[in-house]
Amino acid sequence: MKKIKALLIGLVLSFSAPVFASDFDWSQCWCNYGAGIEKGDMLLSVDAALPWNFFDIINANGWAVPHVIADFEIAAPIWKLPFTFGGYAGVSFWGNKDFSHTAVLAGGSATYHVRMPPKNLDLYSGLKIGVKFDISNEYDNGIRFNPDWGYNIGASWFFSDSFGVNVEFGFPSSKAGVVFKF
């Protein structure tokens, strides 16, 4: 019964979208940024992120502080495709009674945006690649370098021309926070 209800709700929503967005040009959604983002705009997001192993650490009698990550991107389309390019940096802390870790990560990112109704919404998907410096008393030399890569799918909702909130799901972490547009 629950599956039938979910299917009916999905059908109603999918068929009602064109009614609520009758003035929306669906043929242009793949080649335009959402939420009024334009070529040359700069986006800065500050987020709290939960890595995939966050609860494994907690369940192993450990402690963890969610990652704090800042992303900076510039809107730079390729041909007609609405991409943003930039970088990210973050820090996190975790451990247990025997050891502690501090991870510092940094790298580059490329994100593809899609415009959908309503006009305040920006949908996107991206790739990130960089390096993670894992500093711990568990290692002989105190530090390890690891690749830091991932993918995500997310959405931003802008309350004004320059401020919004975002949520992102992906690997190796999912995150939520605020985004500023300059």
Positions of PLM-derived features:
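Bacterial N-terminal signal peptides that target proteins for export
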Residues: 1-8
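Outer-membrane beta-barrel transmembrane domain signature
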Residues: 22-44, 49-182
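Bacterial N-terminal signal peptides
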Residues: 9-16
